Regions:
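Helix-to-loop junction immediately C-terminal to a conserved catalytic motif
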Residues: 160
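Catalytic Walker B motif of ABC-type/P-loop ATPase nucleotide-binding domains
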Residues: 27-30, 262-265
């Protein structure tokens, strides 16, 4: 397979495997679980634990404590520039603020904003998606779930008109004037896309200018920055920020344009619990206020329930099952859906 055809999670696993192949006895891993599905994350952590038993030293920087703590020999917390050794792990987890609870879905019209009929897509000589049938309803929060490489990001790109299907048809019902095929400037005024890599869409010299670029007013840009907890970063250059901060800025900048359809690809990577809480509250506040439609791709169990009215499970390029929030529990449990 060509590396350009790999999913974000597969690329993450490839990079980590390349680092392990160097056989260096000291390994420094910065958020190695980013974009990994639950089985990939568990396999990686078990592999790293095996290496430590062979004399390797492994240092991991990670926000997803529930996946890391069972494998860690020591835990250190960086707070206000100082390292503190954590001996009470239960207290550490208890101190983490819980992610936002799912808000009750408002009564919504069963009105489609987009339909996909028999959609397929090929890249690098491989079939990535095949026979995808899906309806996205106006005002809903739809979650796309599945293992790494199953086609979630590819499906999101087709919905965003960043690529065209090689089979089947995608129809939009946002506005007839937008047509059915091209991703025009007018299209992207109504449809917001947040990529896996925030570096791909941060281009202004300051955070304030980034958020204000597509906002209807300076006051609204300021409101968005307050919602996403990034006011204190206003004068910073976006590319000088941490990955988690970049992620919040990129989402805030797209949200400031008030899109009717918001497509999010792994929006919570790099977020600590407080950042996660702020991000989810901001997204759901805007969703309730504007009635926008949100489609999210995620492997992060912490956020899934708060961004889901309905979920679709993908396997090997096909939608295997759709359901409500109960599908989230199946996806992270031992259900046969996996």
């Amino acid at each position: 397979w060509g590396t350009r055809t790999l999913s974000g999670g597969q690329k993450q696993r490839l990079i980590t495997a390349s680092a392990l192949a160097t056989e260096q006895r000291i390994l420094l891993l910065d958020e190695p679980l980013a974009n990994l599905d639950r089985r990939g994350a568990a396999f990686l952590m078990a592999s790293l634990r095996t290496l430590t038993e062979s004399g390797y030293a492994v240092l991991i920087v990670e926000h997803r404590l529930e996946q890391v703590l069972p494998f860690a020999h020591e835990v250190w917390r960086l707070r206000n520039g100082s390292l503190e050794r954590q001996t009470d792990r239960e207290a550490l987890c208890a101190a983490q603020p819980e992610a936002a609870e799912p808000i009750p879905a408002e009564a919504r019209r069963e009105e489609p904003v987009m339909t996909l009929c028999g959609v397929g897509w090929r890249a690098g000589g491989r079939s990535i998606l095949e026979g995808v049938d899906l309806t996205v309803f106006r005002g809903e929060r739809l979650l796309l779930l599945g293992d790494n490489g199953c086609g979630k990001t590819s499906l999101l790109r087709l919905m965003a008109r960043l690529a065209r299907p090689t089979a089947g048809e995608i129809r939009q019902f946002i506005d007839p004037a937008l047509g059915q095929r091209r991703g025009s400037r007018a299209w992207f005024r109504r449809v917001g896309v947040v990529y896996q890599n925030p570096n791909c869409q941060l281009f202004m010299p300051t955070v304030a200018q980034e958020v204000a670029f597509a906002a209807k007013s300076e006051d609204f840009a300021r409101e968005i920055m307050e919602l996403f907890g990034i006011v204190y970063l206003a004068e910073r250059h976006p590319h000088s920020l941490s990955e988690g901060q970049k992620r919040r800025v990129s989402i805030a900048a797209v949200a400031a344009s008030q899109p009717e359809l918001l497509l999010l690809d792994e929006p919570t990577v790099g977020q600590d619990r407080e950042g996660l809480r702020t991000l989810l509250q901001a997204l759901n506040h805007l969703h309730t206020r504007t009635g926008s439609t949100i489609v999210t791709v995620t492997h992060d169990r912490r956020c899934a329930g708060a961004l889901c009215d309905r979920a679709a499970w993908l396997r090997e390029g096909r939608i295997e099952k759709t359901g409500g929030p109960e599908l989230i529990e199946a996806a992270w449990g031992d259900s046969a859906v996996l």
